[in-house]
């Protein structure tokens, strides 16, 4: 005889249910061939391809509890003669309870797997360890209907200053289902620079990573020691790997080093690189308005073409602005988003910012940013989230007289 507590058993059977067919699991629980066919026909076929199975789950829980009560009251049990089975009433109820528990274990443990399989497929690249994730039509339809949201998991160790990188990843995912080439507009910038004549590897890596992240990265602690110390192996390849190890949000898909098998093809298309000059110096170079520039130990200057590449960034990254410090003629001034953030921080204000995505007639994607700060409201549109946000920020600051 079952008790109310037996409902909790549904999660303990998950191991056997996950490793065998539902048919075998039912038979192992004491069910007959006919009963197994009945269960699969009545229940399994109805929910196996369903994405939202919460209704089935709740129905099973309710039914299991009802059966538990019936098992403690033979008169109630005898009235349930419509249930199809070839065993005595009590055994029949025990079997249905077992069957419901198996279903619940499948619903609880297998749901995530079934949902993912219904929306995505993974294609393994031949001869490579990387995978291509394909979004199925089912997922695209759900996104269009607003029933599916894709978010980037945010590691707790990511600092507030790295939000731009997260937004970048979200931008890629937003456009992913449209099957379009992704272009990320970046601001070329330095990270923390040390001018001791021996830190070019750190300086060049800081510039490349800061540009990709969208914020100057701190490279040294208060004692002046490198935060991403690689000892005597001061090579940008080692430094960037150390950054990844310490959970700076730079990913393998963001760059290739000169030991990668596809390095040459990446190098041809890349707009942002670290190059070695005379085998003794490293600089960060980037393409801006069809000209190549470089950060050489923090100093901005035209690149003369010397050197060979060590690290190249993904071609999706394109430089649309240069941020440099000091009284330099090319200095475009503080970025509008930095100015806005400083104003918000200074006066402890709350900024409301949301985005919409629109597919244009030519197949391109347009982002619209809706921004509100105090009494000021603005709308900005652009080819990227950052561009849309900048346009809205200009309008907001203009309304506030800043």
Swiss-Prot record:
Q: Which GO terms describe its biological process?
A: regulation of translation
- Highest rank taxon of the organism: Viruses
Q: Return the Pfam families for the record.
A: Rota_NSP3 (PF01665)
Keywords of this entry: Host cytoplasm, RNA-binding, Translation regulation
Gene3D superfamilies (alphabetical): 3.30.160.20, 3.30.70.1610, Rotavirus non-structural protein NSP3, N-terminal domain
Where, subcellularly, is it found?
Host cytoplasm
Classification via InterPro entries: dsRBD_dom, NSP3_N_rotavirus, NSP3_sf, Rotavirus_NSP3
- Identify the residue position(s) of the site Cleavage: 333-334
Family matches, as PROSITE patterns: DS_RBD
Gene Ontology terms, MF aspect: RNA binding
Keyword Transferase present in the record's keywords: the answer is no
Name all DRBM domain ranges. 334-402
Q: Name one GO cellular component term.
A: host cell cytoplasm
* Job description of the protein: May play a role in stimulating the translation of viral mRNAs.
Q: Which family does it belong to?
A: Belongs to the rotavirus NSP3 family.
The protein's name in its UniProt record: Non-structural protein 3
Organism (species)? Rotavirus C (isolate RVC/Human/United Kingdom/Bristol/1989) (RV-C)
What lineage is this protein's organism placed in? Viruses, Riboviria, Orthornavirae, Duplornaviricota, Resentoviricetes
């Amino acid at each position: 005889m079952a008790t109310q507590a037996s409902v909790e058993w549904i999660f303990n059977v998950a191991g056997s249910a996950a490793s065998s067919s539902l048919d075998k699991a039912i038979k192992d629980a004491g069910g007959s061939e006919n009963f197994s066919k009945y269960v699969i026909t009545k229940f399994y076929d109805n929910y196996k391809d369903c994405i939202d199975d919460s209704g089935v789950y709740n129905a099973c829980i309710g039914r299991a509890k009802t059966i538990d009560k019936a098992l403690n009251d033979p008169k109630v049990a005898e009235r349930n003669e419509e249930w199809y089975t070839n065993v005595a009433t009590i055994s029949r109820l025990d079997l249905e309870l077992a069957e419901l528990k198996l279903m619940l274990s499948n619903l609880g443990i297998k749901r995530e797997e079934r949902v993912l399989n219904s929306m995505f497929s993974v294609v393994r690249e031949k001869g490579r360890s990387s995978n291509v994730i394909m979004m199925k039509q089912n997922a695209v339809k759900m996104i269009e209907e607003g029933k599916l949201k894709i978010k980037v998991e945010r590691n707790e160790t990511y600092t507030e200053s790295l939000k731009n990188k997260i937004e970048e990843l979200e931008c890629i995912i937003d456009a992913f289902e449209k099957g379009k080439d992704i272009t990320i507009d970046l601001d070329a910038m330095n990270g923390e620079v040390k001018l001791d004549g021996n830190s070019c590897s750190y300086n060049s890596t800081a510039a490349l990573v800061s540009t990709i992240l969208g914020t100057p990265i701190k490279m040294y602690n208060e004692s002046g020691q490198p935060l991403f110390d690689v000892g005597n192996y001061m090579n940008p390849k080692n430094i960037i790997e150390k950054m990844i190890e310490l959970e700076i949000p730079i990913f393998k898909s963001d760059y290739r080093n000169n030991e990668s098998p596809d390095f040459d093809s990446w190098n041809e298309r890349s707009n942002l690189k670290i190059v070695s000059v005379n085998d003794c110096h490293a600089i960060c170079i980037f393409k801006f308005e069809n000209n190549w520039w470089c950060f050489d130990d923090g100093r901005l200057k035209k690149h003369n073409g010397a050197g060979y590449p060590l690290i190249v960034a993904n071609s999706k990254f394109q430089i649309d602005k240069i941020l440099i410090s000091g009284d330099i003629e090319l200095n475009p001034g503080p970025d509008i988003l930095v100015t806005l953030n400083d104003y918000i921080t200074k006066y402890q204000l709350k900024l409301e910012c949301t985005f919409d995505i629109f597919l244009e007639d030519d197949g391109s994607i347009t982002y619209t940013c809706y921004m509100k700060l105090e009494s000021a409201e603005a709308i900005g549109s652009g080819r990227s989230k950052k561009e849309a946000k900048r346009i809205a920020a200009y309008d907001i600051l203009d309304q506030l007289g800043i």
